[in-house]
C-alpha cells in the first residue's frame, strides 16, 4: 500500500499538475497499483511525456519495464477497415483492448479477457476438478460456482460475454469429465 501512495505522488499528481497543462492535446492517465496506461490525442505530446516519464521515474528511484513500455497508435480505424486484433490492440490488467464496430456501424473501444488469462482460468478449474473429485458433488458445485463467479465479477464487462460463456462451458465440461472418472461407472 505504501508503494501505491508513493506512486500517487510520483506519477498521478505530477501528471495532473505538471504534464497536462503543458500538453497541446487531451491526455488521460489510467492507473491500477503499479500498472498504468496514458492515452494522448497527439503523438508529439506522447513522445515528450515518454522522455519526461523516464527522467521522473529515475529521479525517484524507479524505472519503467522496458518490454511493457511502448508508444503505439490506438486511433479509430479508418471507415473501410474492420476491427479486431491489430497493431493498436494492447493488454492491460488481464484485458485485451481493441476497436470493434457497434450495431449501428460506429467504432467503439471494447474489452475482452486476455487469451492467456482465460486459458489459465480454464486450467485452474480443470486442476481443481481433478484434485477434488473425491469430494461431494454439492461441495464441488459450491467451490466451482465461487471460482466462476469470481472470474465473471472481474472480467464481466460489457462486450466480454462470449469469453464468460466460454469459461462457464469449460467448467461444465471439466467437471463432467472428472465426475465420470470417479468410478468405473459412467455418470
What are these model-derived regions, one by one?
Residues 1-187:
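Non-catalytic terminal/accessory segments
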Amino acid at each position: 500500500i505504501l508503494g501505491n501512495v508513493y506512486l500517487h505522488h510520483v506519477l498521478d499528481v505530477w501528471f495532473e499538475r505538471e504534464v497536462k497543462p503543458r500538453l497541446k492535446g487531451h491526455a488521460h492517465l489510467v492507473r491500477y497499483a503499479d500498472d498504468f496506461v496514458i492515452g494522448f490525442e497527439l503523438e508529439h505530446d506522447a513522445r515528450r511525456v515518454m522522455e519526461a516519464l523516464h527522467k521522473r521515474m529515475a529521479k525517484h528511484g524507479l524505472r519503467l519495464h522496458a518490454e511493457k513500455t511502448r508508444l503505439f497508435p490506438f486511433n479509430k480505424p479508418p471507415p473501410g477497415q474492420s476491427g479486431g486484433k491489430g497493431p493498436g490492440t494492447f493488454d492491460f490488467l488481464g484485458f485485451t483492448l481493441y476497436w470493434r464496430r457497434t450495431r449501428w456501424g460506429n467504432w467503439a473501444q471494447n474489452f475482452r479477457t486476455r487469451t492467456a488469462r482465460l486459458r489459465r482460468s480454464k486450467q485452474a478449474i480443470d486442476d481443481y476438478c481433478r484434485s477434488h473429485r473425491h469430494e461431494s458433488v454439492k461441495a464441488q458445485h459450491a467451490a466451482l460456482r465461487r471460482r466462476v463467479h469470481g472470474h465473471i465479477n472481474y472480467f464481466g464487462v460489457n462486450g466480454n460475454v462470449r469469453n464468460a460463456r466460454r469459461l462457464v462451458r469449460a467448467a461444465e465440461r471439466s467437471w463432467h469429465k472428472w465426475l465420470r472418472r470417479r468410478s468405473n461407472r459412467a455418470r
